[in-house]
């Protein structure tokens, strides 16, 4: 079972609203077939949170989104 907490992610991204956006965009990328940056057999949402908690991805996800 996947155990990841918001507190683990907030160490990397202190604003929980930006954390939600970054995790959403990364999970969407993973669901579309992008390669995960960590070894994980979890669903895209959990994998995205694990990547953020591990420092493998973060707020740069927000800079990739066209405005």
Swiss-Prot record:
> What are the recorded Gene Ontology BP terms?
DNA-templated transcription
What is one GO cellular-component annotation here? DNA-directed RNA polymerase complex
Record's catalysed reaction(s): RNA(n) + a ribonucleoside 5'-triphosphate = RNA(n+1) + diphosphate
Q: Which Pfam families match?
A: RNA_pol_Rpb6
Which enzyme type, at the first EC level? Answer: transferase
Q: Name one GO molecular function term.
A: DNA binding
* Keyword annotations from UniProtKB, A to Z: DNA-directed RNA polymerase, Nucleotidyltransferase, Transcription, Transferase
Question: By its UniProt entry, which Gene3D superfamilies does this protein fall under?
Answer: 3.90.940.10
- EC nos: 2.7.7.6
Annotated family: Belongs to the RNA polymerase subunit omega family.
Provide the function of this protein.
Promotes RNA polymerase assembly. Latches the N- and C-terminal regions of the beta' subunit thereby facilitating its interaction with the beta and alpha subunits.
Q: How does it assemble?
A: The RNAP catalytic core consists of 2 alpha, 1 beta, 1 beta' and 1 omega subunit. When a sigma factor is associated with the core the holoenzyme is formed, which can initiate transcription.
Designated name of the protein: DNA-directed RNA polymerase subunit omega
């Amino acid at each position: 079972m996947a155990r990841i907490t918001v507190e683990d992610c907030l160490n990397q991204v202190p604003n929980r609203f930006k954390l939600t956006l970054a995790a959403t965009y990364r999970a969407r990328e993973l669901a579309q077939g992008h390669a995960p940056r960590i070894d994980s057999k979890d669903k895209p949402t959990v994998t995205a949170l694990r990547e953020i908690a591990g420092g493998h991805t973060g707020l740069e996800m927000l800079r990739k989104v066209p405005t």
